[in-house]
């Protein structure tokens, strides 16, 4: 029997507001434990929540960017459960009237475009953070308690773990472009739970789903889903029954492990939040938020192809993160050739960042620095080999490319007389290479060019060297 996989994702995104959703407590990341909280966050008796309007604006902005319909009437509800990181024993969330519904985004997998529906986007407060010591007790930090979140729930339209990865990448990219969140999984500002079930191909009814947690990277999401897909298939093929449960992905064993039997929404006993009035969002408010949405990745990608003449692949890679795209834009504004700047960002820059496990904000390279380097290559002032030396200096120490080239004497040698002398010396020292080339061994030219580049410390102009080599060989 063959099965169809059905996947739905629940993504929690922390909003980048200066204060919490229902109190004036600040929201910086990395502060000392329990220093960014208040009596409202901790649910002391007699205190009342006050809704942060900016959190509503940010939620609307995210929902609009995800093509959601924005509610005119919305409200907050209490989600009742007890856990040490939830001091009030309830979470203020949205149940039956979310701020956004019926959205969608498009993903690309295997060269094909697919639309993934978004069921809803709703506002809620985050919980605190538990740290398990392993010594029989846990520590709780309430700094995160009350931080504004949006929960984005996809339709069960995802059919493969690869599609799930693509969906998360696209969702993160869109949210980052809006500016409402930095979406850093390592800091907890983007978290994901996955629901997965299998059903026989052709069957309309969904199978019993399991929920996956502890997915702290997109790669873990994909790996966890791949394992769960195999596990469920094995259970079903052996005549077993899938239980509705919550499992976690364990990287060490590369398996999913049972955490608990899954609760349904009824277990939370939702009811309207009595301390907050219903929220009315009129058309004027919606329009103001809509007007504040910047250019999104798909729009920017299209512009790069149509206006800058970039290949579709370049445009896709450059627009995947707002940081890279903004850097590219700034470099082009400073006079860099678009294609050359794209090549450097996708090549040398990305390779360096990956090797060092850094982001663009962590290095000394600036858009002006990259633009200066690209312009020197365009003018023929430096060769591509020398450019790599200059690049290393720029990304590690910063500075001006032209100044570095002059100070270090790295200007490309393009003087014909100087180059002809180097060519003559190389030919005199390597008569066998001349014979090899004349006998059809084209690699001999590459060897001779290498000798000249070595003699010139990489500063000889390669195209001119090739031209002069052929001229001199033909004379012999």
Curated annotation (Swiss-Prot):
What's its job?
A: Allows the formation of correctly charged Asn-tRNA(Asn) or Gln-tRNA(Gln) through the transamidation of misacylated Asp-tRNA(Asn) or Glu-tRNA(Gln) in organisms which lack either or both of asparaginyl-tRNA or glutaminyl-tRNA synthetases. The reaction takes place in the presence of glutamine and ATP through an activated phospho-Asp-tRNA(Asn) or phospho-Glu-tRNA(Gln).
Describe, as the record does, how this protein assembles with itself and its partners: Heterotrimer of A, B and C subunits.
EC number in record: 6.3.5.-
Per its UniProt entry, what is the enzyme's top EC class, as one word? Answer: ligase
What is the name of the protein in this document?
Aspartyl/glutamyl-tRNA(Asn/Gln) amidotransferase subunit B
Record-stated family: Belongs to the GatB/GatE family. GatB subfamily.
List keywords of the entry alphabetically: ATP-binding, Ligase, Nucleotide-binding, Protein biosynthesis
Q: Which PANTHER family match?
A: GLUTAMYL-TRNA GLN AMIDOTRANSFERASE SUBUNIT B MITOCHONDRIAL AND PROKARYOTIC PET112-RELATED, GLUTAMYL-TRNA(GLN) AMIDOTRANSFERASE SUBUNIT B, MITOCHONDRIAL
According to its UniProt record, what is one Pfam family this protein matches? GatB_Yqey
Question: Which InterPro entries does the record cross-reference, listed alphabetically?
Answer: Asn/Gln-tRNA_amidoTrfase_suB/E (IPR017959), Asn/Gln-tRNA_Trfase_suB/E_cat (IPR006075), Asn/Gln_amidotransferase (IPR018027), Asn/Gln_tRNA_amidoTrase-B-like (IPR003789), GatB (IPR004413), GatB_C_1 (IPR042114), GatB_Yqey_C_2 (IPR023168), Gln-tRNA_amidoTrfase_suB_CS (IPR017958)
**Keyword Signal part of the UniProt annotation:** no
Whether Protein biosynthesis counts among this entry's keywords is yes
The record's Gene Ontology biological-process terms are:
glutaminyl-tRNAGln biosynthesis via transamidation; translation
NCBIfam families in alphabetical order: gatB, PRK05477.1-1, PRK05477.1-2, PRK05477.1-4
Q: Which GO terms describe its molecular function?
A: asparaginyl-tRNA synthase (glutamine-hydrolyzing) activity; ATP binding; glutaminyl-tRNA synthase (glutamine-hydrolyzing) activity
Q: Which reaction does it catalyse?
A: L-glutamyl-tRNA(Gln) + L-glutamine + ATP + H2O = L-glutaminyl-tRNA(Gln) + L-glutamate + ADP + phosphate + H(+); L-aspartyl-tRNA(Asn) + L-glutamine + ATP + H2O = L-asparaginyl-tRNA(Asn) + L-glutamate + ADP + phosphate + 2 H(+)
